[in-house]
């Protein structure tokens, strides 16, 4: 049995500095020194499975093997989400944006859930669009849902969740947009396939090139930028601005803002920003 403060694996200061450098260089994520215990805890589980004793052995793997690199990044990324998280954003979509789109009789709508994790955010969005009747007046709707972590994307693409997840979903959406699992899926629930078809899930590193060929009507990037340093955040905000249509909307997490890029947007409150 290990004594208190005794570590099972060696993680030197040099090792941790490498991890900080690697995560920032590769995916833009800033890991402050205060995250060292978290990093050690997550990596130690992986090292135990691989039969490694020192992080230098792990480093050799991620430097030589692309799949190991991806798995390493997945291990250190945080994926906390739920249906209708920060519900005021979805109320704004249904009560403000949808009436505007309907009045303008838009024929095409493009959305992006950036940092979609296990899929609750894009599925919430499509549920709101369906409940508000957007599909009745707009024939061409597409939601791109992206994340860095390939493991969470695999789960998201299935659209299957424990029945306990319904606790955060208002009843009117739950009845209309989800079905309960039966037989081997008993105890689970699933987004209806008729809604799932509007969503495309893809792996994407936010600090690399984006694949979009069209300007977007709405970007949801909530509680993602908190993991980036200030220069990276500002670069992303500028790129979001360029990717949005004039009048397009950017929604950020409750503790995030556009910072020094405020001249690019009109702030409507509650971390809702309209492209100038």
Curated annotation (Swiss-Prot):
Asked if the Swiss-Prot or TrEMBL record annotates the protein with the keyword Methyltransferase, the reply is yes
Q: Which taxonomic lineage does the organism of this UniProt entry have?
A: Bacteria, Pseudomonadati, Pseudomonadota, Gammaproteobacteria, Vibrionales
Q: Which GO terms describe its cellular component?
A: methyl accepting chemotaxis protein complex
Q: What is this protein called?
A: Chemotaxis protein methyltransferase 3
Q: Which SMART domains match?
A: MeTrc (SM00138)
Q: Which organism is it from?
A: Vibrio cholerae serotype O1 (strain ATCC 39315 / El Tor Inaba N16961)
What's the encoding gene here? cheR3
Q: Which residues form the CheR-type methyltransferase domain?
A: 4-276
Write down the PANTHER family for this protein, in alphabetical order.
CHEMOTAXIS PROTEIN METHYLTRANSFERASE
One GO MF term: protein-glutamate O-methyltransferase activity
Q: What GO terms in the biological process aspect are recorded for it?
A: chemotaxis; methylation
Q: What's its EC?
A: 2.1.1.80
Q: Which residues bind S-adenosyl-L-methionine?
A: 79, 81, 85, 121, 147, 205-206, 222-223
Q: Does the keyword Protein transport feature in the UniProt annotation? A: no
Give the domain of life: Bacteria
The UniProt function text for this chain reads:
Methylation of the membrane-bound methyl-accepting chemotaxis proteins (MCP) to form gamma-glutamyl methyl ester residues in MCP.
Catalysed conversion reaction: L-glutamyl-[protein] + S-adenosyl-L-methionine = [protein]-L-glutamate 5-O-methyl ester + S-adenosyl-L-homocysteine
EC top class, in one word? transferase
Q: What UniProt keywords apply to this chain's record, in alphabetical order?
A: Methyltransferase, S-adenosyl-L-methionine, Transferase
């Amino acid at each position: 049995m290990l004594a208190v403060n005794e570590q099972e694996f060696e993680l030197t200061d040099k090792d941790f500095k490498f991890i900080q450098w690697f995560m920032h260089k590769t995916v833009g994520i800033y890991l402050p020194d205060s995250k060292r215990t978290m990093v050690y805890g997550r990596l130690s589980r992986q090292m135990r499975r691989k039969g490694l004793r020192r992080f230098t052995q792990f480093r050799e793997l991620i430097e030589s093997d692309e799949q190991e690199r991806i798995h390493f990044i997945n291990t250190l990324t945080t994926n906390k989400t739920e249906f209708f998280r920060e519900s005021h954003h979805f109320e704004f979509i249904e009560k403000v944006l949808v009436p505007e789109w309907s009045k303008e009789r838009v024929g095409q709508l493009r959305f992006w859930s950036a940092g979609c994790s296990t899929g609750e955010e894009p599925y919430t969005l499509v549920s709101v669009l369906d409940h508000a009747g957007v599909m009745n007046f707009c024939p061409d709707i597409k939601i791109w849902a992206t994340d860095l972590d390939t493991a969470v994307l695999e789960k998201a693409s299935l659209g299957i969740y424990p029945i306990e997840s319904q606790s955060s979903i208002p009843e009117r959406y739950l009845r209309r947009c989800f079905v309960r699992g039966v037989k081997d899926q008993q105890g689970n629930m699933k987004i209806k396939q008729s809604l799932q078809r509007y969503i495309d899930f893809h792996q994407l590193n936010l600090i690399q090139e984006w694949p979009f060929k069209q300007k977007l009507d709405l970007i949801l990037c909530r509680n993602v930028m908190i993991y980036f340093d200030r220069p990276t955040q500002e670069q992303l905000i500028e790129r979001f601005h360029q990717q949005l249509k004039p009048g397009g909307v950017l929604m950020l997490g409750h503790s995030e803002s556009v910072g020094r890029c405020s001249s690019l947007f009109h702030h409507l409150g509650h971390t809702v920003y309209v492209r100038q």
